[in-house]
């Protein structure tokens, strides 16, 4: 009999996605948005080469004149010193002195680029976005500058949780990029994840993972997590397991042992389910009481009650498993199944004492009977019946009759058997016990008469 169904708690465990775009983008943008008016490089993570333009189109980019360069450098110094008011005033004066027409397209693009940095630093993302849009609207700016800016625009939309516009901006960047790197594919995947287009999200994160594998590089843990979640959402259990097994190869953490155990359960691979959870347990990873209880259930399902009992006993003693009736009941039942009646009794005593109903006292009485403690069995079962909530009072009264019989309280035993026999489910057994008791009493009478 299967005691435990992992599906009840599989979904909550796997719905947590370790990577969300908005959580990752803001710190990255803060690191990347340093203003460099003379630089055309796309900000990238150190381990990846900067993407190149898809086509080497010829652009006649105007020169940056010395007097404009000097003003931009002055504004940049103020911005880097966090004197944003002074930086903005310098830029305002540059435009006001001769109007926008006094600046060529490249100079104006650099002015808007620095405006965007100032607005971003002030956390005014709407104005920052508008300024960046003004950068890319200028004709004949360097391709690398346009690529960098379009990528930043996409990131800012994601920071604002404007997922669809972020996706559209990022796709524009992809269109003009010859060799998008893996991080860009992950960013696009996160955008699609947020708009619940899981197929496209999965395609892009898998592309990123494959790109790293092709270079013999270890894909990032967050990427695997995003793929894992997306496969689970598509109800592709086999692929979810594949990803979890890869995670365990490179990032052998507790959460992945627990999750893959759940997934093996979904695949009805009970041996693998137990082995995965046991691996986490023996390494001391299962520090939560609920996880230890799950471990015990898996042992019980596998007909290894002794190990289940040991898990429960250890957790209850060290306090990691909650001191409540249900947990003591599991421990007591496991010890009993393991034929350890003496250890089962104190656990079930605690379970019964903490329960609001009499069922556990009835079960405790049964265990007392197994241990030949007949008087205690009588007391426990009567207490359970008086308390109420016994699932099968007829069964409890049968056991009560046996305890009275073994304690030589024959009249009370007869009453208990008769009471049990009023329920048709126990009538046959009650009648058999009464006949057996009558024959035994007759035998004892004849022996006494000599």
Protein language model annotation of sequence segments:
Residues 3, 26-133, 144-148, 425-450:
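N-terminal leader/linker segments that initiate helical-solenoid repeat arrays
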Residues 325-339, 345-394:
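Alpha-helical adaptor scaffolds
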Residues 57-63, 96-104, 136-142, 171-179, ...:
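Solenoid-like repeat scaffolds
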């Amino acid at each position: 009999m299967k005691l435990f169904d992992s599906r009840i708690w599989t979904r909550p465990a796997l719905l947590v996605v370790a990577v969300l775009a908005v959580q990752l983008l803001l710190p990255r943008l803060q690191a990347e948005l340093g203003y460099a008016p003379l630089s055309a490089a796309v900000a990238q993570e150190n381990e990846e080469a900067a993407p190149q333009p898809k086509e080497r189109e010829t652009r006649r980019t105007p020169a940056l004149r010395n007097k404009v360069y000097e003003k931009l450098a002055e504004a940049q110094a103020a911005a880097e010193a966090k004197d944003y008011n002074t930086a903005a005033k310098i830029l305002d004066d540059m435009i006001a002195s001769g109007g926008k027409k006094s600046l060529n397209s490249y100079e104006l693009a650099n002015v808007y680029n620095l405006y965007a940095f100032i607005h971003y630093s002030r956390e005014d993302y709407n104005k920052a976005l508008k300024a960046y849009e003004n950068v890319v609207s200028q004709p004949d700016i360097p391709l690398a500058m346009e690529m960098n800016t379009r990528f930043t625009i996409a990131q800012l939309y994601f920071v604002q949780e404007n997922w669809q516009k972020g996706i559209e901006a990022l796709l524009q960047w992809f269109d003009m990029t010859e060799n998008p790197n893996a991080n860009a594919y992950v960013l696009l995947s996160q955008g699609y994840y947020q708009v619940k287009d899981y197929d496209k999200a999965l395609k892009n994160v898998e592309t990123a993972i494959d790109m790293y594998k092709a270079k013999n590089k270890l894909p990032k843990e967050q990427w695997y997590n995003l793929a894992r979640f997306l496969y689970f959402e598509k109800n592709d259990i086999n692929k979810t397991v594949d990803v979890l097994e890869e995670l365990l190869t490179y990032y052998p953490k507790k959460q992945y042992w627990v999750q893959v155990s759940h997934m093996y359960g979904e695949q009805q691979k009970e041996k693998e389910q137990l082995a995965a959870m046991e691996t986490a347990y023996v390494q001391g990873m299962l520090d939560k009481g609920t996880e230890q209880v799950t471990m015990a259930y898996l042992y019980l399902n596998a007909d290894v009650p002794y190990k289940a009992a040991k898990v429960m006993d250890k957790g209850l003693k060290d306090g990691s498993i909650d001191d409540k009736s249900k947990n003591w009941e599991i421990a007591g039942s496991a010890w009993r199944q393991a034929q350890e009646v003496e250890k089962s009794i104190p656990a079930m005593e605690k379970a019964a004492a903490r329960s609001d109903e009499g069922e556990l006292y009835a079960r405790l009485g049964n265990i007392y009977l197994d241990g030949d403690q007949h008087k205690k069995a009588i007391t426990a079962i009567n207490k359970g019946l008086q308390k109420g909530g016994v699932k099968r009072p007829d069964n409890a009264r049968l056991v009560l009759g046996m305890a009275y019989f073994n304690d030589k309280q024959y009249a009370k035993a007869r009453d208990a058997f008769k009471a049990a026999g009023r329920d048709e489910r126990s009538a046959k057994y009650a009648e058999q016990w009464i006949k057996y008791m009558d024959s035994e009493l007759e035998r004892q009478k004849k022996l006494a008469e000599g």
